[in-house]
UniProtKB/Swiss-Prot annotation:
PANTHER family reported in the protein's UniProt record: GLUTAMYL-TRNA(GLN) AMIDOTRANSFERASE SUBUNIT A (PTHR11895:SF151), TRANSAMIDASE (PTHR11895)
Matches recorded under PROSITE patterns: AMIDASES
Protein name: Glutamyl-tRNA(Gln) amidotransferase subunit A
A GO term, aspect molecular function: ATP binding
One Pfam family hit: Amidase
Keyword Nucleotide-binding: yes
Subunit and interaction comment: Heterotrimer of A, B and C subunits.
Family: Belongs to the amidase family. GatA subfamily.
Gene (UniProt): gatA
């Protein structure tokens, strides 16, 4: 009996009822990974021995915790004490953290079992997972297509039913865009909802960790586990933990839905428009009221994001110098040369591009023209959302302007690649919660519906997503892959 297509809820019930043992589930997981991941390439490292040992110990224990015996994959920019963390970069090859990230501690406290670390764009910079130093991940729905990025391995592993859930990180769309491309459920929580302690920083004012699953309720369960105030993270918000799964199925009659006209305009493919408009009509049939609104400053989102995120990245990545950990270049004659050679050889092209862009934006004479101006535009984008949320409960639109593109099609065209995140970036700039759920397909490649909520109102997003999932879900499609 293959357990790969079962939900977290179903697997937990089976373990509780002693229909299966945790060790059987973990053994089945590794059988599937070893059989299928030679093609998908979602995992960078596996922790088979430790996972099986932990599962066998659990066989003799009374089930406790929301994730007892459940296998999980973690994006490789979230540090794990016992498994290498590389951020898919040569410069961190062989790096082993001396501690677990807060989210890992929370997952372990609920008795989840880590099976491995997942591929990504190097240092989370990219939208296709082609920027990984180690391997290229493919889209389980179409092996010629990218899985999205930067959390491409996290989305692909879940879509291929190798694990029931994974964690990704989202700085400008890096959970939601791959979730859209791979036909899975991806949540970027409100900034501060989930601790970033142990997440290797890209852009600290934008980064947020979130779950990727095959159904909405599983996603809510995982967010419940990883949420909460953390004294190790000064940006962690002092808000009460929420039971996201309770009343997840309540009806949405009277829900006020806003649809930004900019999100269905130029650049959005006809197939994506049609699927998203059909999903919006479905919400209307369920009793929601839908009105068009405007988010006029969203068009400046991509430019604003690349100035701010690259500026923060140039500072955050200064610590990788070949001295303390990771890759160290050979043949340097002095300290300055060691720094230069290590960073030149250790970082990939996209990371270098963003470091240079960020350093330029922060440099004397350009700071006011670029960085300071971008901060002002960020405020305007945030105010646009605040105005809309005075009268509406949720904003709905596409997650990405198109379906997944072919591997190799955009890797040499950074501006086109950057534009793929035009619909997700503004939400990070505003610090809001947002999720992608499947709403259609075009030529076998999935289309995602993006739901955007008020600060710390992930519960409403899950409620709407769950109701929509009852009329459109991908369960049978996962089994056909």
């Amino acid at each position: 009996m293959s357990l790969r297509y079962e939900s977290i809820e179903s697997l937990s019930q089976m373990i509780q009822n002693k229909t299966i043992r945790p060790s059987e589930l973990i053994e089945d997981t590794f059988v599937n990974i070893e059989k299928d991941d030679t093609v998908i390439n979602s995992f960078l490292a596996l922790d088979k021995e430790a996972a099986l040992e932990k599962a066998k110990t659990m066989d003799n224990e009374t089930p406790s915790g929301k994730l007892f015996g459940i296998p999980m994959g973690i994006k490789d920019n979230i540090v794990t004490k016992d498994v290498e963390t590389t951020c898919a970069s040569k410069i961190l090859e062989g790096f082993n953290s001396v501690y677990d990230a807060t989210v890992m501690n929370k997952l372990n406290a609920e008795n989840g079992i880590l099976v491995g670390k997942l591929n990504m764009d190097e240092f989370a910079m990219g939208g296709s997972t082609e920027n990984s130093f180690y391997k290229k991940t493919v889209n389980p729905f179409d092996h010629k297509a990218v899985p999205g990025g930067s959390s491409g391995g996290s989305a692909a592993a879940v879509a291929a039913s190798l694990v029931p859930f994974s964690l990704g990180s989202d700085t400008g769309g890096s959970i939601r865009q791959p979730a859209s491309y791979c036909g899975v459920v991806g949540m970027k929580p409100t900034y501060g909802r989930v601790s970033r302690f142990g997440l290797v920083a890209f852009a600290s004012s934008l980064d947020q960790i979130g779950p990727i699953t095959r159904n909405v309720k599983d996603n809510a369960t995982v967010l419940e586990v990883i949420s909460g105030l953390d004294p190790h993270d000064s940006t962690s918000a002092p808000v009460d933990n929420v039971d996201f799964t309770s009343q997840i199925d309540k009806d949405i009659k009277g829900l006020r839905v806003a649809v930004p006209k900019e999100y269905l305009g130029e650049g959005v493919s006809e197939e994506v428009k049609a699927s998203v408009q059909a999903a919006i009509k479905a919400l209307e049939k369920m009793g929601a009221t839908v009105e068009e609104v405007s988010l006029p400053n969203s068009k400046y989102g991509v430019a604003t994001y690349y100035i701010l995120s690259s500026s923060e990245a140039s500072a955050n990545l200064a610590r990788f110098d070949g001295i303390r950990y990771g890759y160290q270049a050979e043949g340097a004659q002095n300290l300055e040369e060691l720094y230069k050679k290590t960073r030149q050889e250790g970082f990939g092209d996209e990371v270098k591009r963003r470091i240079m862009l960020g350093t330029y934006a922060l440099s004397s004479g350009y700071y006011d023209a670029y960085y300071k101006k971008a901060q002002k535009v960020r405020t305007l984008i945030k105010q646009d959302f605040e105005r809309v949320f005075e009268n509406y409960d949720i904003i709905v639109g596409p997650t990405a302007p198109t379906t997944a593109f072919d591997i190799g099609a955009q890797i040499n065209d950074p501006l086109t690649m950057y534009a793929n995140d035009i619909l997700t970036i503004p939400i990070n700039l505003a610090g809001l919660p947002s999720m992608s759920i499947p709403c259609g397909e075009s030529n076998g490649r999935p289309i995602g519906l993006q739901l955007i909520g008020k600060p710390f109102d992930e519960k409403t997003l899950y409620n709407v997503a769950y109701n929509y999932e009852q009329i459109f879900n991908m369960h049978e499609r996962y089994q056909s892959l």
